[in-house]
Amino acid sequence: NYMNEIREMETLDTDIVIVGSGAAGLTLALRTADFARVTVLSKGDLQDGATYYAQGGIAAVLDDSDSADSHVADTLHAGVGLCHRDVVEHVVERSASAVSWLVAQGVPFTTKSTAVATGDDAAPSSPAELSSLHLTQEGGHSHRRIIHATDATGKAVFQTLQQRAREHANI
């Protein structure tokens, strides 16, 4: 019966439970695991989530010719009234630091030199080298602000964050 099943369940000693193992869940796990024991729950295979299959890139203001105001305006225009300005501003203002954190984790984003067809997938060696990232321009954007990992950005982000989480003693 159900009560016997509950008594036989494994008990985990943890401080934080994160439901979801995509980019958001793994990022939260990695950002909290230095001061807490973290358990990440997934409803199925880890790579069944949307992050793994996302092919596009990540939009961030990383070029001197671009600005947060321009990115916000582009996003609000493309969102045709569905976006909340305060949320868009919040995300855009933090986009460069989020990309910097992903670079520090080792996500192999395409760089200007690798985009020239060297075949090398080396990522910038430090967040200070964000200027070496290859930027593309996609629909709805007035500037080149899309960073990518070839044509499989989501897979690269997911695999890197998953590896970091597996390596962390508190996750």
Briefly describe each language-model feature range.
Residues 1-16, 34-36:
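Extreme N-terminal leader/targeting segments of oxidoreductases
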Residues 5-6, 43-171:
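Conserved N-terminal/central alpha/beta ligand/cofactor-binding core
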Residues 12, 39, 110:
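General small-molecule cofactor/ligand-binding pocket signal
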Residues 15-40:
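N-terminal Rossmann-like FAD-binding beta1-loop-alpha1 element of flavoenzymes
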